Amino acid sequence: MIQSAKELLKKGAAELGVQLDAAQLESLNLFAEELKKWNRKINLTAITGDEEIALKHLVDSLSLLKAVRGPGRLLDIGSGGGFPCIPVKIVQPDLEMVSVDAVVKKISFQKQAVRLLNLTGFTALHVRAETLAQEYAASFDWVVSRAFSDIPSFVAMALPVLKPEGRIVAMKGRSAAEEVEGAKDKLDALGAGVLEVMDFTLPGTGDARSLVVIGRN
């Protein structure tokens, strides 16, 4: 990435309370370059400019660390081009990651990025999330996604693979208060409830973001 994008990445992460060291910055930069290279051949993301990638993919992914900290096991459902799981893994290597997406080319990219970055404790799977319960029942401390539009559907998919005291984190691209209120009865029926809603502004953009943290009742 160009120097201004690297500076935005470092500054944006710091505003979220994440201090990136030189090695982490270099790994995030390598990941961004690999994303751009693959994106010229296959459609991984509509966000292609360096500064946009730095803020709307990398810093946005790292915002998950407001709610999640290692060690532990984390499942990212609908991870696409590796967001938020790969940036979070770079910064929190003690999180064991499983990343799933239904699009094979996106998982192929993730596997290549993981090899390039020498990340260990990271499994990328081309499966539908609905099929995970058999192999991964009650396996994860955190189940996260920034892909779901509907919180109850995400929670229903996450609960079978969540440890009893585990947490579900829905990353929302706007203030989530209204959606959370509307989902309350459906979550209650699933035996789950919202524990916390963390509203914030994505650094460098002015865009509203929310992390909705959910647990079992």
Curated annotation (Swiss-Prot):
The gene is rsmG. GO terms for cellular component: cytosol. S-adenosyl-L-methionine binds at G78, F83, A129, E130, R146. Its EC number is 2.1.1.170. Keywords: Cytoplasm, Methyltransferase, rRNA processing, S-adenosyl-L-methionine, Transferase. It is an enzyme of class 2 (transferase). GO terms for molecular function: rRNA (guanine-N7-)-methyltransferase activity. It catalyses: guanosine(527) in 16S rRNA + S-adenosyl-L-methionine = N(7)-methylguanosine(527) in 16S rRNA + S-adenosyl-L-homocysteine. This is Ribosomal RNA small subunit methyltransferase G. Transmembrane segments: none annotated. The lineage of its organism: Bacteria, Pseudomonadati, Thermodesulfobacteriota, Desulfuromonadia, Geobacterales. It is found in: Cytoplasm. Specifically methylates the N7 position of guanine in position 527 of 16S rRNA. Belongs to the methyltransferase superfamily. RNA methyltransferase RsmG family. It comes from the Bacteria. InterPro entries: rRNA_ssu_MeTfrase_G, SAM-dependent_MTases_sf. The keyword Transcription does not apply.
